C-alpha cells in the first residue's frame, strides 16, 4: 500500500489516504479482531465514555445531515450509525496524542479523520463542518469521466476529509475527544490541545473511485435496507424495542480498569437541563392609548403592532414630525400617515430631546402642541421583503446610529441546508451582519427550515467576537476581532 500525504490545512485537519492494488474490505469478524487489539479482555469494569453523549449525538446527526444533501445527489448513500468499537479504537489512538494517523494495522480496514485545536472551545461539530466544507474544492467525477478509474479532482489543499465523510458505503462511525497536555503539531508544542479522532467503517477514499453513485436519492440502495429511505439516505427501519430508563450508568461502557480521566476543555462546558426554548419577538403588541415612554423600556422598542380603531380613541398626540414621548404610538402613526384606522405595523426611532412640539391637522386627526423640552420619537412604515438564502444584513440594511430599521424578512425553505461557504453564519444570538439572514433564522429557531417564514431583524453595533454553536441542525462559526461590519439580532414573528 502506498500512502498519499497531502498539505497541511487550517485548524489542524488531516486525513491519510491509502491506495491499494485490490479492493479489500474485511468482514465483520476480521474487523472485530483488529479492533480487539486496542481493548482489554477483562469484562465488567466500567469507565466513562471517550466522548460526551451530547458530542456523540452532534457528530452523528451532522454527518447524516450532510451526507443527505450532497450535490450531485447520491443514489446509494447509506445512513450512518454510531459504533462503540470504533469509538474505543479512536479513544485508544487519541490518548497517544500523536498528530498522525494510526495505528498502522488498523488503517488497512478503517478510515480516519483527525482534528486538533487549542485556545477557546470549539465543538466537534465545528470540525465536522470544516471537513465537509472541503467540498468547495472538490469536483465530483461523473461515470463518463471514469475510464475506468476516476481521476482525482481536488483544487484545494485537501478534499479527503470530505470524501470520507460522504463515502456511500461507509455506514459506521465512532469518535473520541482527548485533551493532550502537550502535543507536537507540525513541529510546535501545543499545550492543552483538544484532539478529535473519528474512525469510519467500512473505510472510504479508495483511489480511482467516486465517493458515491449519482442519481435519484435511495434509488440504488443495497437490498439489505429493504427499500427504506430517510432524508435521502438508505435507511433500515429499526424494530421497536423498550427503552431502559436513562441513568448515569447509561453513559458508561464495558472496559478494562483504567485511571479515570476528566476531560479538561480549554473553555469548560456546563451541561444544563434542557428547558423549553423562549421565543423572542421584536414586535410589541400595543393598545391605542399606549404611550411611547411607557412601552419603550428595553432594546427591542422599535417595532409595534397597532390594533384597529385607534382613530376615534381619545389618547393624546403631541407634535407633528417629531412626537413627544408621552404621545400615543398608534395615534401618532395614524397622524403621520404610516397606518390608517385598520391598524398595522409601525417602526419607531427615538430621537432625544426636542425644545418644543407643534400641533397640526393630518389624516383625520389633530395633534397638540407642547412648549417644553422633552424626549421625542419619529414613526415610519414597515415594509416586507422576500430574500434568498444568501442575503445579509450588511447588504440589506447595515447598522447606522442612532438606529436602522430593516424590512420584515420573508425567507424561503431549506436555507439551513445551504453550504457555509455560500451562506455562512457567524455567532450565536447576536450574529455578524455578513451572515446569511435566513440561515441565522434557522439557527436561532426563529423559522422552521422545512417551510421558511417571516423574521424581524434588528441591526446593532459590532461585537469584538462571535462564538459559533450547533443549533437546530445549523453549525454557526466563530469569528474573532472582525475588521469590518456590524451585527444583528433576529426575532420570530407572531403569526
UniProtKB/Swiss-Prot annotation:
Q: Give the UniProt tissue specificity note.
A: Present in kidney renal tubules (at protein level).
List, for all copies, the residue spans of the domain called LCCL.
Answer: 282-377, 383-486
Q: Which cysteines are joined by disulfide bonds?
A: 288-306, 310-330, 389-411, 415-438
Q: Where is the SCP domain?
A: 60-200
Gene3D superfamilies in the record, alphabetically?
CAP, LCCL-like domain
Does the keyword Signal feature in the UniProt annotation?
A: yes
Q: Which InterPro entries match?
A: Allrgn_V5/Tpx1_CS (IPR018244), CAP_dom (IPR014044), CAP_sf (IPR035940), CRISP-LCCL_domain (IPR051957), CRISP-related (IPR001283), LCCL (IPR004043), LCCL_sf (IPR036609)
Could you list this entry's UniProt keywords, alphabetically sorted: Disulfide bond, Glycoprotein, Repeat, Secreted, Signal
Q: In which broad location class does this protein mainly occur, judging by the first location in its UniProt entry?
A: secreted
GO cellular component terms, alphabetically, are: extracellular matrix; extracellular region; transport vesicle
> GO MF annotations for this entry?
glycosaminoglycan binding; heparin binding
**Pfam family of the protein (one):** CAP
Give the domain of life: Eukaryota
Q: Which GO terms describe its biological process?
A: extracellular matrix organization; face morphogenesis
Compartment list: Secreted
Q: Which residues are tagged as glycosylated in the record? A: 27
Span of the secretion signal? 1-22
Give the matching PANTHER family: CYSTEINE RICH SECRETORY PROTEIN LCCL DOMAIN CONTAINING 2, LCCL DOMAIN PROTEIN (AFU_ORTHOLOGUE AFUA_5G08630)
Subunit structure, interactors included: Binds to heparin, dermatan sulfate and chondroitin sulfate.
Name the job this protein performs. Promotes matrix assembly.
Per its record, how is this protein called by name? Cysteine-rich secretory protein LCCL domain-containing 2
Q: Which gene encodes it?
A: Crispld2
Amino acid at each position: 500500500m502506498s500512502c498519499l500525504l497531502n498539505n497541511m490545512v487550517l485548524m489542524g485537519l488531516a486525513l491519510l489516504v491509502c491506495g491499494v492494488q485490490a479492493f479489500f474490505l474485511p468482514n465483520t469478524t476480521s474487523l472485530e479482531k483488529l479492533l480487539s487489539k486496542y481493548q482489554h479482555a477483562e469484562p465488567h469494569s466500567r469507565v466513562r465514555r471517550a466522548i460526551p453523549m451530547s458530542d456523540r449525538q452532534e457528530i452523528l446527526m451532522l454527518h447524516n445531515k450532510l451526507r443527505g444533501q450532497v450535490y450531485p445527489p447520491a443514489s446509494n448513500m447509506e445512513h450512518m450509525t454510531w459504533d462503540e468499537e470504533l469509538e474505543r479504537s479512536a479513544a485508544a489512538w487519541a490518548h497517544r496524542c500523536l498528530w498522525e494517523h494510526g495505528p498502522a494495522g488498523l488503517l488497512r480496514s478503517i478510515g480516519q479523520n483527525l482534528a486538533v485545536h487549542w485556545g477557546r472551545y470549539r465543538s466537534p461539530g465545528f470540525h465536522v463542518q470544516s471537513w465537509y466544507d472541503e467540498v468547495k474544492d472538490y469536483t465530483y467525477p461523473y461515470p463518463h469521466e471514469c475510464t475506468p478509474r476516476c481521476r482525482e479532482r481536488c483544487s484545494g489543499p485537501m478534499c479527503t476529509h470530505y470524501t470520507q465523510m460522504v463515502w456511500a458505503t461507509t455506514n459506521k462511525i465512532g469518535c473520541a475527544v482527548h485533551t493532550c497536555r502537550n502535543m507536537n503539531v507540525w513541529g510546535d508544542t501545543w499545550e492543552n490541545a483538544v484532539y478529535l479522532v473519528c474512525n469510519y467503517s467500512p473505510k472510504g477514499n479508495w483511489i480511482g473511485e467516486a465517493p458515491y453513485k449519482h442519481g435519484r436519492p435511495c434509488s440504488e440502495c443495497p437490498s439489505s435496507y429493504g427499500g427504506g429511505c430517510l432524508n435521502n439516505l438508505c435507511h433500515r427501519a429499526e424494530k421497536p424495542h423498550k427503552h431502559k430508563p436513562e441513568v448515569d450508568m447509561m453513559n458508561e461502557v464495558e472496559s478494562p480498569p483504567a485511571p479515570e480521566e476528566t476531560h479538561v476543555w480549554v473553555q469548560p462546558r456546563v451541561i444544563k437541563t434542557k428547558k423549553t426554548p423562549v421565543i423572542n419577538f421584536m414586535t410589541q403588541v400595543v393598545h391605542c392609548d399606549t404611550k411611547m415612554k411607557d412601552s419603550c423600556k428595553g432594546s427591542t422598542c422599535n417595532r409595534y403592532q397597532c390594533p384597529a380603531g385607534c382613530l376615534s380613541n381619545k389618547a393624546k398626540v403631541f407634535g407633528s414630525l417629531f412626537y413627544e414621548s408621552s404621545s400615543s404610538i398608534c395615534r401618532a402613526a395614524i397622524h403621520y400617515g404610516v397606518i390608517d384606522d385598520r391598524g398595522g405595523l409601525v417602526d419607531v426611532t427615538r430621537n432625544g430631546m426636542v425644545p418644543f412640539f407643534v400641533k397640526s391637522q393630518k389624516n383625520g386627526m389633530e395633534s397638540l402642541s407642547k412648549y417644553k423640552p422633552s424626549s421625542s420619537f419619529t414613526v415610519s412604515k414597515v415594509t416586507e421583503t422576500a430574500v434568498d438564502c444568501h442575503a445579509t444584513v450588511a447588504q440589506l440594511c447595515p447598522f447606522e446610529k442612532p438606529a436602522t430599521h430593516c424590512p420584515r424578512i420573508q425567507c424561503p425553505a431549506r436555507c439551513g441546508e445551504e453550504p457555509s461557504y455560500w451562506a455562512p453564519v457567524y455567532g450565536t444570538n447576536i450574529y455578524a451582519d455578513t451572515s446569511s439572514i435566513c440561515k441565522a433564522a434557522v439557527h436561532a429557531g426563529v423559522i422552521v427550515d422545512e417551510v421558511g417564514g417571516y423574521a424581524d431583524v434588528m441591526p446593532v453595533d459590532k461585537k469584538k467576537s462571535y462564538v459559533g454553536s450547533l443549533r437546530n441542525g445549523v453549525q454557526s462559526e466563530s469569528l474573532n476581532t472582525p475588521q469590518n461590519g456590524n451585527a444583528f439580532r433576529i426575532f420570530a414573528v407572531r403569526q
